């Protein structure tokens, strides 16, 4: 037996392929989930009292510091970051209703497909949907000439395609057919 197709003796299972798929599936799932969650994050500035480093107590003068903290809330949601959205709004090849729908659905779709992938619920379907989302994001970035982002998304599309090829090694899933 060669190392490329190393099977457990007599089981017919390619554990290397299974482990490769699990690692890639895990990475793509975590990437999608956290990217979707980040769509609900924003920075808020709060004031905190200045702490005297020598005593560890609040400064007696009452001096305050502005500190940025990250908070997550439904009201913070922005599927497409404002600077990109401002550029995309003026793009004639991107209809406004499509941009609005994509902006509203991107975060929840990333979280949903990421969770599906992580749990093994419709693994192939969730990978395919993620691939379509990355293609749609690529179209937008091409239109506003964000070539670095296009290259990064190309890598994501390649990873999704590779995961779809490895899906035959998906041994740990709740719904294997999809």
How would you describe each model-predicted region?
Residues 1-112, 119-178:
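Extended, low-polarity transmembrane helix blocks
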């Amino acid at each position: 037996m060669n190392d490329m197709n190393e099977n457990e003796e007599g089981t017919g299972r390619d554990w290397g392929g299974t482990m490769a798929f699990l690692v890639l599936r895990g990475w793509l799932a975590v990437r999608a989930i956290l990217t979707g969650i980040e769509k609900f994050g924003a920075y808020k500035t709060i004031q905190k009292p200045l702490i005297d480093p020598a005593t560890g107590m609040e400064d007696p003068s009452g001096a305050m510091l502005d500190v940025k903290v990250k908070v997550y809330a439904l009201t913070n949601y922005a599927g497409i970051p404002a600077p990109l959205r401002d550029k995309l709004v003026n793009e004639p090849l991107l209809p406004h209703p499509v941009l609005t729908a994509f902006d509203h659905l991107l975060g929840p779709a990333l979280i949903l497909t990421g969770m599906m992938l992580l749990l093994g619920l419709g693994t192939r379907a969730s990978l395919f949907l993620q691939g379509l989302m990355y293609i749609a994001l690529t179209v937008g970035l091409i239109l506003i000439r964000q070539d670095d982002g296009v290259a990064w998304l190309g890598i994501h599309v390649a990873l999704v395609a590779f995961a779809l090829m490895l899906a035959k090694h998906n041994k740990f899933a709740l719904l294997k057919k999809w």
